[in-house]
Amino acid sequence: LVAVTVSVDDDGTAQSCHISGDFFIESVSDAESHALLHDLERALISDDSLRSVLDAHPSCQIIGTDEIAIKTAYSRAVSSNLPPLAGAPAQRVGVGSPDAPNIPASINTQTKQPDKSSEYRERWNALKPQLTVIHDHPRTPDEQMAIDETWAREVAAGTRQPTIRLWEWAGPAVVIGRFQSAQDEVNLDIAKQLGFDVVRRCTGGGAMFIEPGNTITYSLYAPLDFVQGVSIEESYRLCDWWLVEALRELGLDVRFAGLNDIASQYGKIGGAAQRRFPVGSGGAVLHHVTMAYDIDAAKMSRVLNTSREKMSDKAVK
């Protein structure tokens, strides 16, 4: 989903706006990503072409939304039926991308994908001799976010071996995506009351509801060569191939769903996020996954401002 918050003057004229959501942006730097969003926001206010803005940032790629969805969210916010009042809160409207609808996993996963198992196995076999697997000790949510980006940048710089890190959480958390709005995604007062830390990760995607012992989280820090020649969409399947195969060997009916989800016949059971860290001729890909197996859905619904659309494919009860 992409959301646009619009601030209007006394006459109802849009003065500024802010784009947020669970989309991803791949770029050479944080500055490039922020510049793209800033230029898109300016184009919305001035009614300029969003496609021209995207074309002017060839080093950036948006995944999970597009200019049509962004423009639609902005138009809905501006033309909201709520009368603009001086000093009233900015209006925020979210909309899903028409190119990436949130289809329930039971439907979406029926789409046949080419079988790339042999290619994925070859890539993993090539990576395996260099790969270190670490079952990490419990860390606070802030520490988890910091170490994830630090280790990814170290692999990118060649100072750390490719690594799989299995997380342990020291406390409950809500982890929001790189471009999400905390106040829009989380009931911050309730989260604080219940002892949840709200932290932002360095990758895009949606909010994760974490309670220690109820989730499995892992990160893969791999050289960028591991995903060389593979589209961003396909790289999610490559990075999670070993996990899906392992779950199937345990007798579980799991498959890939949408861009970045892992699903069973009951719905979504896990979600992934990914980001590339290009550095000269090297670089790294950070890919992390959280699978929830015992969610307290009632508590989650209190802590998160989760839309009905986003909940439509979640295997919770």
Where are these regions (language model features)?
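Catalytic cores of processing enzymes, dominated by hydrolases/peptidases
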Residues: G267-K317
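Residues forming anionic-ligand binding surfaces in small-molecule and nucleic-acid pockets
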Residues: G206-F226, S312-K317
